[in-house]
Amino acid sequence: GCCSYPPCFATNSGYC
């Protein structure tokens, strides 16, 4: 998963 840090979480917000 790519939900550990803000930049990546924001990009995958609908997928995290």
UniProtKB/Swiss-Prot annotation:
Disulfide bonds join 2-8, 3-16. One of its GO terms (molecular function) is toxin activity. The keyword Disulfide bond applies. GO terms for cellular component: extracellular region; host cell postsynaptic membrane. It is found in: Secreted. The modification Cysteine amide is found at residue 16. Signal peptide: none annotated. Keywords: Acetylcholine receptor inhibiting toxin, Amidation, Disulfide bond, Ion channel impairing toxin, Neurotoxin, Postsynaptic neurotoxin, Secreted, Toxin. Its main location: secreted. Residues 4-6 are annotated as: Ser-Xaa-Pro motif, crucial for potent interaction with nAChR. Expressed by the venom duct. InterPro entries: Conotoxin_a-typ_CS (IPR018072). The keyword S-adenosyl-L-methionine does not apply. It comes from the Eukaryota. The cysteine framework is I (CC-C-C). Alpha4/7 pattern. Belongs to the conotoxin A superfamily. Alpha-conotoxins act on postsynaptic membranes, they bind to the nicotinic acetylcholine receptors (nAChR) and thus inhibit them. This toxin blocks mammalian nAChR alpha-3/beta-4 subunits. This is Alpha-conotoxin AuIC. It comes from Conus aulicus.
